[in-house]
């Protein structure tokens, strides 16, 4: 699928929702904004700001314009400079701040109030708390008994496509991107004439939990939107794992199709929704997913 096809799908989905399609994406620097890089250190600088991310720590560079262009082209830790054999103070502080932000988003919980505000049914895996979630990934792959009964009682049976949302390893990925990805995704699936299941939220879920969900509800395609493991300074990245006719006993990781890096600095959520709709349609046509699909 090329960029033109993606833009057509986005326009079609947004038109069906009565909204204007976003302008075509333009090449832009990888930092939040193209802030003019600065070289001086400041104790008062917000380490999460665009100015801090654009900071250049190399003193008296031979080609300052080259460093400026390099700094604007990536969010990687380049041009930070050294103080003898050690990193400069501001570079070290920003590293520690980014590490802290990533750690926080792993340990945070998605608020129950947020789930209720979205009108989502909430179920959970066999995990009861965050510590157990991080140490027992096997338990995060299975629904608890109460969740199984809730899905059977409250969800549409035998849908063409079942959409599931789970916190995963990043709560920010869910709460930040939800409103920009789920409405266009649901609208696009319905516009395609597909029978769409009841979307719901799984607390403490791992990727493989979608196999049990698909088996319980009899879904042809299961789409799991889950928070990615955060990187340094990037805690809002969402992934989509889609699988055709999942089964607990037989589905393996190669059967899944993954779309990752969904966030404003990567694949925009609205664009990702359009790609997922097209992916679901192709899965149903080919009756396959993962490495079994033909391009």
From Swiss-Prot:
Its cofactor is adenosylcob(III)alamin. Keywords: Bacterial microcompartment, Cobalamin, Cobalt, Lyase. Pfam families: EutC. GO terms for cellular component: ethanolamine ammonia-lyase complex; ethanolamine degradation polyhedral organelle. Its main location: other. GO terms for molecular function: cobalamin binding; ethanolamine ammonia-lyase activity. InterPro entries: EutC (IPR009246), EutC_C (IPR042251). It is an enzyme of class 4 (lyase). Pathway: Amine and polyamine degradation; ethanolamine degradation. Binds between the large and small subunits. The basic unit is a heterodimer which dimerizes to form tetramers. The heterotetramers trimerize; 6 large subunits form a core ring with 6 small subunits projecting outwards. HAMAP family: EutC. This is Ethanolamine ammonia-lyase small subunit. It comes from Escherichia coli (strain SMS-3-5 / SECEC). The gene is eutC.
């Amino acid at each position: 699928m090329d960029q033109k096809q993606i833009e057509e799908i986005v326009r079609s989905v947004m038109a069906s929702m009565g909204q204007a399609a976003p302008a075509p994406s333009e090449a832009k620097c990888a930092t939040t904004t193209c802030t003019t890089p600065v070289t001086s250190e400041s104790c008062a600088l917000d380490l999460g700001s665009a100015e801090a991310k654009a900071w250049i720590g190399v003193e008296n560079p031979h080609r300052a314009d080259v460093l400026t262009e390099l700094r604007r082209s990536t969010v990687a830790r380049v041009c930070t400079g050294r103080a003898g054999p050690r990193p400069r103070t501001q570079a070290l502080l920003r590293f520690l701040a980014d590490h802290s932000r990533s750690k926080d988003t792993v340990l945070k919980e998605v608020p129950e109030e947020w789930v209720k505000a979205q009108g989502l049914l909430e179920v959970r895996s066999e995990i009861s708390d965050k510590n157990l979630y991080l140490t027992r990934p096997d338990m995060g792959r299975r629904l608890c008994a109460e969740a199984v009964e809730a899905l059977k009682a409250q969800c549409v049976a035998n849908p063409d496509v079942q959409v599931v949302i789970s916190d995963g390893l990043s709560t920010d990925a869910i709460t930040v991107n939800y409103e920009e990805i789920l409405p266009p995704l649901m609208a696009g699936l319905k516009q395609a004439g597909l029978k769409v299941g009841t979307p719901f939220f799984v607390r403490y879920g791992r990727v493989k939990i979608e196999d049990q969900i698909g088996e319980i509800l009899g879904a042809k395609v299961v789409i799991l939107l889950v928070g990615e493991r955060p990187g340094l300074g990037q805690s809002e990245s969402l992934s989509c794992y889609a699988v055709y006719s999942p089964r607990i006993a037989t589905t393996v990781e190669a059967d899944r199709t993954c779309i990752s890096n969904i966030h404003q600095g990567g694949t925009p959520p609205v664009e990702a929704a359009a790609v997922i709709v097209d992916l679901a349609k192709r899965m149903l046509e080919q009756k396959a997913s993962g490495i079994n699909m033909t391009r």
